Amino acid sequence: MQNNYIPNIDLSKLVSNGINSQYSKEIANQIKKASEEIGFFTVTNHGVPLTKIDILLNTCRKFFYLPESEKIKIAPKKWNPHTETVYRGYFPSSVNGKEGLDIGDPQLTHDMKDLISKQTFEVNHDMSYLDPQWQFIINDYFDELHNLGMLIFKTIISVYSPNLSVADTAFQRPKTLSTLRFNFYPKQERPVEISAQDGVALGCETHVDSGIMTILYQDKKGGLQVQNRNTLEWHDVPHNSEAFVINTGLALEYLTNGRMKATNHRVLFNQEERISIPFFFEPSFDFKLDPKYLDIVEESKYGIDCYEDFLTNSLKKFVEYDRPN
């Protein structure tokens, strides 16, 4: 297995000097190469304070260590018929071996009737009863990751077009469908599945992500692997407690007309308890995944979908989003 297959990109100069600085082109080229050839890279010196990540991890543990009877109170209707949500909230480990908590944009409120009338928009559960600081901690981290996503996305846009305002068009809060997810892997006794390709025991099945990109933090090495698109060989993603793992999603593949492809990844079975926190950076529901936004003029290979329709179709393959009508 090749060492250093996943490149690390130091964002310090981009964070300090901005997207229009003399340093942005060099970093843009690094991101372009990693995204086009591999679909995964890590970033360090990303501007998100590590103390905020530590506080978030502690808050996560506090929630997941609650009795199941408490957590299920904020589960979607599939597990708790007394709640109003279908997607947002807690899902138990019976789904796919891990517990989870899905949180949407905290800027979405009950008085935004036009948005919450749509199937994909739900106001987050009030969890201040668990911790008075919960809402502040979650909102603050969501903002940090949204801003980091915007910085990386604008850097990607700059590879193809000078029109960086496309990012502002694509990500109009609270119209975005971005999701902050907490994954809690308890000490697992058996794998989720056995890989049909190489017989390896898995804690999370092989898949690609749907959004523009995913920004992932892991509290410890969790067995994340990436598949080489050409050789089909699997490579470990190195763990760094000061880094985020970035992977390009299917929406970015559509938007770049196949230049930056979504990449298969999986998680090896691991009996050690751990937490991972992916932020699925997803655009406004009505944003069209049209390559012309990036000055890519050839005919789209995929057809042009608004993101809401695209996401609805993409999520059908994920068991945790299998919901009754």
Task: Describe every region a protein language model picked out.
Residues M1-N325:
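Peripheral, non-catalytic segments flanking oxidoreductase cores
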